[in-house]
Amino acid sequence: MADRFNMSGDFRGAIINIKSTLTNVQQSIGDIPSDDETARKELESLIGQLSEALQKVPAEHQEQAQAVAETAKVLVDTAKAEKPNKTMLQISGEGLKQAAQNLAGVMPTVLTIAGQIVMTVAKLTGTM
């Protein structure tokens, strides 16, 4: 059973933070050492789709949405290393899927997109 959090307050800034985080992630995808331009473009598209989906998450789930954005950032940052650490990639990928799972009830597409991001990063880094 998933944890439930009751949150109140002004979450308008959270959407901006999510968009900013994922815009930075999109811009850094070019730094992943890979010759697979198709996978690189696919990852950029998936991050864009994730950003759009997370901006539609209800206010009471913004904390979970922010966790998804931050975990996607960690995954891409890990993949950018000259020799990406396969264990860290696996942990970051699982973390992204788990963070997305927390939103599956309100935004199921986030879980699908997160899984596709993990697979695409694995293709780019040769860890598949």
Which residues make up each language-model segment?
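Short amphipathic alpha-helical segments that predominantly mediate membrane engagement
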Residues: 1-9, 19-103, 119-128
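Mature extracytoplasmic or organellar-lumen-exposed domains after removal of signal/transit peptides
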Residues: 110, 114-117
